[in-house]
Amino acid sequence: MNMGTRTELKRAIRKGAVQVNGEKITDPGFMVNENDEIIFAGEPVPYFRYEYYMLNKPAGVITATEDRYQKTVLDFFGERRRKDLSPVGRLDKDTVGLLLVTNDGGFHHRLLSPKKHIDKEYYARIDGRVDEADREKFEKGIYVDEIFTALPAKLMIDGYRENALESDFMDLANSRAPKSALENGVSEIRVVVQEGKFHQIKRMFHALGKEVIYLKRIRIGSIVLDHTLEEGTYRR
């Protein structure tokens, strides 16, 4: 049911288009609960306590609920969205792919708690050749810096191309990836981690002397990004 924007809905309420438990309501600020029967324009309105969305995040957008200066992932949901929606975890500004959005705090916790050991799988393009030695280092756990040593992770090497293309590069907002990949060639890989540290995948490859030039999250646990979703679109 399309009920319009918040402004349009308030106008409709004032005109008496909404009934709650059989009584006409004209105050847009009237509070309802999950047991109330709500009728809008003659049709029942179902109540959903929790909402869950899969968003295919594009590059150049920050993972936040609001920001005065930059576009956020919640801006894709428009004015009609529930005000208690928030992203589950985060993706870097220049990282694309699977992002879950919900108002279910328990769901947030189950996916993000380190104790749950939830897999997060990424597809990436790397400047230069990724080899078996790199895979073994990922498997053992990579020392990133004096503060962070990554837990063992699964690295899958899908292929290597000697001739990189401009289209191989993400919209690099804050990456250190050099354009030398146009000369060095590009490796296509997938990596599975169970952590979610700041810039983790980029930092792990940087510790091996390699740079990520494109990064896309494709799976969280058993939830796989719908390949039919265009970047910047979402579904329930």
PLM-predicted stretches and their roles:
Residues 1-236:
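Basic, flexible Lys/Arg- and Gly-enriched helix-loop patches that mediate nucleic-acid binding at interfaces
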